[in-house]
Amino acid sequence: MAITRIGGATAITGTIPQGNIANASLGAVTALPAAIATGSVLQVVQAITTTAVTHVSDGGQVDTGLTASITPSATSSKVLVLISQNNKLERGSAALLNYELRLFRDSTEVEYWDSVCAVEVQNDGSFYGSNHAYHYQDSPSSTSSITYKTTGKIVSSGGGRTVRFQDGSAPSTMTLMEIAG
């Protein structure tokens, strides 16, 4: 449909054909129509890190280096957090290696996965490497910027255990999806 000008230069009605809209101008949209249904994906943010972090047993919680930020457009929005956390495990001379992963929204812990990896690996210095997938739906009730991050901790007792996050520049990813509430 062509654009129709009614009442001078200030009142315009009609539909702009899709081919006439530059993708770059879509980023300038600041308001959403009231008719967006709940459950609609409003925005997606992804962060990737390849920075290696080494954690040894009895070292407490360690920041894995995986972090992402999002600014929800409404306080009723949910944030779906999708994580692919890379790690390599070495149990040393111990029989078992167990570690936990925690998810923080800013400084608040919002999720905790216990014994996310319980493995028996050789004690000859070899490693067991993998990516683990996690998900969490958050209700932050905020329109301010929110930062999510993961931390890890070896929970098996005794020394000689090591967890290496993003070892050898292997990527870990965090995807944040704002869902209309």
Where are these regions (language model features)?
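Short, solvent-exposed loop/turn segments enriched in Ser/Thr/Gly
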Residues: 62-64
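Extended, low-complexity regulatory regions
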Residues: 66-68
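Solvent-exposed, flexible loop/coil residues
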Residues: 16, 20, 25, 57-60, ...
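Glycine-rich, low-complexity segments
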Residues: 1-52, 181
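Terminal beta-strand-rich extracellular "head" domains
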Residues: 54-56, 71-181
